[in-house]
């Protein structure tokens, strides 16, 4: 019996959240083509035979002077030290520079190099990219090109991970797929709906605060606030005749209901808090974990 923690690390938009959902077999983490979509750690748990693998999805590595982004990067770096193993994700379209920066981290556990988005190219380009990483072969334990549209890759990745985990009793009940607080999961489902429903810079200047969750036998009631920094952004989030906020609510309820398997009553409000992203205490205590 093995059990251990595996941190998913890589630059923004490398496909970490998509891979987490693929490996766990459930939609846990928000997925968006917009960069820096992931703001909180989300843990997913997968069983492979008798072995338990706890995945930690983290914000993407990037350079930024903004307080919120710095805290997001700190979350990602800290998760490396907390892990038994790292999956470093690199898009098939990227060069090796991000990986070389990762190798400069002194205290890091063993890692597997995952090449993502291979479905967007051909076998020749995949082989060429594998050749570019071959010079680092003494650094990684394995390198795996992955196409998450094909289920066969799931077993291959989990098998390689299980080989490297320590012998340990289960950290969590093997029947659960996440130990992340439901508030954080529901919050990200709502934020993902915001990302899909509005364009431009609005999602980057907004976040979600879950105020209350009331669970009953057949229904869960959720009260939440979408926080943004200007009245003009608030009007965009509301939309003409309330169309946008209605669309956000419909998408959010479906995602939460699909996950929780119960009927959802969602009360969404929009709250303006100017400069919230520069309020370090607010960001630390409410938005980034």
Curated annotation (Swiss-Prot):
Provide the function of this protein: An essential GTPase that binds both GDP and GTP, with rapid nucleotide exchange. Plays a role in 16S rRNA processing and 30S ribosomal subunit biogenesis and possibly also in cell cycle regulation and energy metabolism.
**Segment G3: which positions?**
57-60
On subunit structure and binding partners, the annotation says: Monomer.
Signal peptide coordinates: none
Q: Which GO terms describe its biological process?
A: ribosomal small subunit assembly
Output the superkingdom of the source species.
Bacteria
Region (G2) spans which residues?
36-40
Residue ranges for the region (G1) are 10-17
Read off the HAMAP family from this record: GTPase_Era (MF_00367)
This entry's Gene Ontology molecular function terms read: GTP binding; GTPase activity; ribosomal small subunit binding; small ribosomal subunit rRNA binding
Q: Tell me if RNA-binding is a UniProt keyword of this record.
A: yes
- Location of this chain's protein in the cell: Cytoplasm; Cell inner membrane
What is the name listed in the Swiss-Prot or TrEMBL entry for this protein? GTPase Era
Q: Which family does it belong to?
A: Belongs to the TRAFAC class TrmE-Era-EngA-EngB-Septin-like GTPase superfamily. Era GTPase family.
List keywords of the entry alphabetically.
Cell inner membrane, Cell membrane, Cytoplasm, GTP-binding, Membrane, Nucleotide-binding, Ribosome biogenesis, RNA-binding, rRNA-binding
Q: Does the keyword Manganese apply?
A: no
Query: Locate the KH type-2 domain: which residues?
Result: 186-274
């Amino acid at each position: 019996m093995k059990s251990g923690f595996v941190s998913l690390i890589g630059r923004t938009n490398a496909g970490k959240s998509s891979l987490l959902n693929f490996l766990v077999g459930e939609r846990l983490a928000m997925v968006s083509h917009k960069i820096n979509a992931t703001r909180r750690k989300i843990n997913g748990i997968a069983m492979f035979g008798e072995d338990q693998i706890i995945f930690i999805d983290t914000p993407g590595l990037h350079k930024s002077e903004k307080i919120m982004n710095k805290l997001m990067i700190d979350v990602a770096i800290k998760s490396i030290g907390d892990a038994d193993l790292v999956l470093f994700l690199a898009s098939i379209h990227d060069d090796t520079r991000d990986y070389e920066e990762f190798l400069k981290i002194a205290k890091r556990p063993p890692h597997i190099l995952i090449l993502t988005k291979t479905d967007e190219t051909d076998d020749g380009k995949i082989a060429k990219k594998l050749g570019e990483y071959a010079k680092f072969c003494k650094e990684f334990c394995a390198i795996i090109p992955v196409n998450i549209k094909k289920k066969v890759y799931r077993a291959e990745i989990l098998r390689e991970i299980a080989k490297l985990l320590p012998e340990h009793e289960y950290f969590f009940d093997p029947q659960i797929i996440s130990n992340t607080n439901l508030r954080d999961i529901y919050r990200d489902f709502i934020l993902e709906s915001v990302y899909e429903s509005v364009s431009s810079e609005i999602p980057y200047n907004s976040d979600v605060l879950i105020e209350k969750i009331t669970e009953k036998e057949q229904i869960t009631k959720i009260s939440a606030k979408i926080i943004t920094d200007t009245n003009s952004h608030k009007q965009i989030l509301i939309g003409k005749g309330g169309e946008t906020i209605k669309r956000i609510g419909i998408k959010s309820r479906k995602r939460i209901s699909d996950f929780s398997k119960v009927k959802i009553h969602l009360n969404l409000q929009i709250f303006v808090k100017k400069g919230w992203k520069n309020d370090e205490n607010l960001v630390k205590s409410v938005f980034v974990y």
